Structures are given as structure tokens and as C-alpha cells.
């Protein structure tokens, strides 16, 4: 089986629009909460998976954002948030289909100059997988950021389809 066209309201998140490179996004799912820190940093481990892999790399750029806002944070997103779901070894490359993949796309050409591999060391091909439905997903990634102890911060986890409402990500 696979996940495609799940019936949900077509919510569009402005921050995900930016992460996806300004293209049309659909079916955003968002979880937000406030928390009080007990130390000087936070970290979360996560995996981004999608049915867009591998066929729709370089065309449907589903996106994920882990937006942190609070004292000392002055990012470009809502509430001055920063997206801390970034590709390891980069300072601002968001985790999306086009930014983590093995370079295969809808024509199946691994040497397409218009669709080179992007951070393939973090991509896991799962086509034909039986345990997890997504055809591809990232290795376990870590979102982290320095914070001020005892202060209240806000986190928003958001994911969306890009350009279509099919082949979901999660």
C-alpha cells in the first residue's frame, strides 16, 4: 500500500511556503506547543519520510519545518522563529524532498544534470519496503538549538505536500 490523497482540510502554512521555495503547498499538518526549558539547549530526533521518493524528486518538493521561537531567537519565520529542521552540515538548508535524495527522479535517470543527488548520505531508499509505507525517508536527523534556561519557547512542527495533494509525506 501507499499513502496518497488522504482526506484532510487544505490548510496552507505560510512558513512552509517559504521552506518549500515559494511553490504552492497543500494539506499542511501542524503541531504547536509551548515549553519551559530546563537547560541551555534543546534537541529532537526525527525522520522525514515521503511517498514522493524516488519518482518525484526535483518536481514535488514536499517540506518539513521545525520552527522554534522565543527569547534570543530572531529568525525569518512567524514569531521570529528559526527552522531547526536543517540538513546536517548546513546552516539553513531545510529538510525537503529536493534537499535530501539519491538523485533519482520521475525519469529514473540517476545522472540527470537537472536533478543531482542532494545529501544522499542522509537518504534511505525504501521502495518495496514492508514495515514503513513511505518509499524513502531520511536517516535519523537531529534538530538542536541553544536556549535560555527557565524561559518559555514555542515550537511548531509542520509538514506539507507541495504542488499537489497526492503522495503524502510524514
Question: Where do the model's predicted regions map?
Answer:
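Aromatic (Trp/Tyr/Phe) and Gly/Pro-enriched flexible surface segments
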Residues: 1-170
